[in-house]
Amino acid sequence: MQTLLVSSLVVSLAAALPHYIRSNGIEASLLTDPKDVSGRTVDYIIAGGGLTGLTTAARLTENPNISVLVIESGSYESDRGPIIEDLNAYGDIFGSSVDHAYETVELATNNQTALIRSGNGLGGSTLVNGGTWTRPHKAQVDSWETVFGNEGWNWDNVAAYSLQAERARAPNAKQIAAGHYFNASCHGVNGTVHAGPRDTGDDYSPIVKALMSAVEDRGVPTKKDFGCGDPHGVSMFPNTLHEDQVRSDAAREWLLPNYQRPNLQVLTGQYVGKVLLSQNGTTPRAVGVEFGTHKGNTHNVYAKHEVLLAAGSAVSPTILEYSGIGMKSILEPLGIDTVVDLPVGLNLQDQTTATVRSRITSAGAGQGQAAWFATFNETFGDYSEKAHELLNTKLEQWAEEAVARGGFHNTTALLIQYENYRDWIVNHNVAYSELFLDTAGVASFDVWDLLPFTRGYVHILDKDPYLHHFAYDPQYFLNELDLLGQAAATQLARNISNSGAMQTYFAGETIPGDNLAYDADLSAWTEYIPYHFRPNYHGVGTCSMMPKEMGGVVDNAARVYGVQGLRVIDGSIPPTQMSSHVMTVFYAMALKISDAILEDYASMQ
């Protein structure tokens, strides 16, 4: 009996150890000297240790015969304490060494630059994001197969992989009473990524239920689980959190349990500069990568099978361009020989965010977050008829304008994308905007235009990869509907903040406050928004997965066209935006592509 008690005590104490003690082993295992891998050969090299990179590395190395090297510019950060682990500290990490903070070009909409927040460390942006766990509309994912020809990329398959990644925690009675709704059939329970209600232990604010009451008066559904393929309505939602409320980031979940595998190595503090290509045959082949920290200190490491780019939608396309894979018009002026001519870096689609914030009465105090995924008609309200007229008459003009600005390469192909978006809006009633409510001391709405029609680009500006000189231009609001949509959604947030049951807790507006008349019309909002918004940090599309003739860079197995042994496996490849937070889809992508890689590996044995 005494032995049993002692054993139980030891187990309990071990479980209670702070994460920074439990993670000492992983930090000691990380390689920091590039000479440890320089000149070596492994089966697979992964450029980038973020969400998709670490998920794929963990999946591939389940086979002890497969060796994987992950190269990451940052370090292990999951044990940094509340600034990383506490989702309620969202934003505090911005501007630190864990934030790449990529700067855009000077934006035409306001003659200012903006910062793109992106995680620099093992786990990537799962270290710094808000942790929201929702899924897009079924029609959006289905279109990847039906419109873009990506066989196997449909809702049923992608949702199955997303559930495979998930370890869901159902809300308790208190959380359900506060506004959570849970459909067990829409969640996985045996996966790796912990997802469940955010709960500080404080009472929940009644403002969430007040919002639900206010939108129900408008015919908007409220008992919604945003994981089921139709995110329209108002509800609370899961976050990527353990039950003890510690962030469930990609390094904690995919690397920490697996770092002791002898076939998995992780090199930190190094940048992948370019892919090494062999051109002995008719088709170039990726045989490794060059990596380093600056031009005078680079190394090569070699891949027996494949190189997998997972550096994110801002950086993976630049690695391709530095490698000679991209548009001749971009590469040749920099003195880079074009090995494969592809529209790399185009089709960049990021969302925008503006804020409406109000003071609340003491009766409204408490924790709580909820989202209103609003349809096109709900977003535009009385302006809906005119907005639909734009959709029905302007698509071809918008495509021509986007191509002329360098955001895409072909008007006909872009028109197919626009018609797809119109189909979502008109025939499937997908969510067009998101009003994200946080009740932490205020009633604050972050408001997103979810489906931008504008197209931007990212391109290198120098042939030296280690200078990190590239132009990132999302071209925010250069499409008239995008500006109108962001303006209308933000106007809607102001309206709902002081409507119906919400009025009970309204104690005056602080943002926009006096910066915009309370009775401002939509035209006034379109003048206000360009100077009072931020990027949403959800850029996709820069190495789009679609047919070459439509502007694709990779095929439906994420293989780069015209190159053997090279894939892009990150947020660069979705060909469209989504009415969702993107993590659920990115985890599904990583697992689905991993299976494709493993199938190819098995066929070679």
Curated annotation (Swiss-Prot):
The N-linked sugar chains of the glucose oxidase contributed to the high solubility of the enzyme in water. Its main location: secreted. It is found in: Secreted; Secreted, Cell wall; Cytoplasm; Secreted, Extracellular space, Extracellular matrix. Changing residue 591 to E: Does not affect stability but causes a twofold increase of the enzyme's specific activity. Its cofactor is FAD. Optimum pH is 5.5 to 6.0. Changing residue 576 to M: Increases significantly the enzyme's thermal stability by generating a sulfur-pi interaction. One of its GO terms (cellular component) is extracellular region. Changing residue 442 to G: Optimizes the charge-charge interactions at the surface of the protein 3D-structure. One of its GO terms (molecular function) is beta-D-glucose oxidase activity. The high specificity, high turnover and high stability of glucose oxidase make it an ideal enzyme for biosensor applications and such as the detection and quantitation of glucose in industrial solutions and body fluids. Glucose oxidase is used in the food industry for removal of residual glucose, e.g., desugaring of dried egg products, and as an antioxidant in the production of beer and soft drinks. O2 binds at residues 559-560. Disulfide bonds join 186-228. Belongs to the GMC oxidoreductase family. Homodimer. This is Glucose oxidase. The lineage of its organism: Eukaryota, Fungi, Dikarya, Ascomycota, Pezizomycotina.
